[in-house]
Amino acid sequence: MAISKGDKVRIRREESYWHNEVGTVASVDTTGKYGVLVRFEKTNYFGMQGTDNGNLTNSFAESELDRA
């Protein structure tokens, strides 16, 4: 599928907070299992506890992503 930096992707990993969400590929590293770093607009559940902190990125395997 050859995902590259800047591509919009949909997350297929069911246990992910961002399942079925669309994010932007921030970087691709082909040396590891979870080599695709995806950036999202909204923070995950760590940012929902009265603070502005939270993760905006997560790493995924290329097989867990679909082009959006």
From Swiss-Prot:
Residue stretches in coiled coil: none
Keyword terms of this UniProt record: Membrane, Photosynthesis, Photosystem I, Thylakoid
SUPFAM superfamilies xrefs: Electron transport accessory proteins
Keyword Thylakoid: yes
Cellular component terms per the entry's GO annotation: photosystem I reaction center; plasma membrane-derived thylakoid membrane
An example Gene Ontology biological process: photosynthesis
Record localization: Cellular thylakoid membrane
Membrane topology term: Peripheral membrane protein
Family membership noted in the UniProt record: Belongs to the PsaE family.
Biological role stated in the UniProt entry: Stabilizes the interaction between PsaC and the PSI core, assists the docking of the ferredoxin to PSI and interacts with ferredoxin-NADP oxidoreductase.
UniProt-recorded name of the protein: Photosystem I reaction center subunit IV
Top-level taxonomy: Bacteria, Bacillati, Cyanobacteriota, Cyanophyceae, Synechococcales
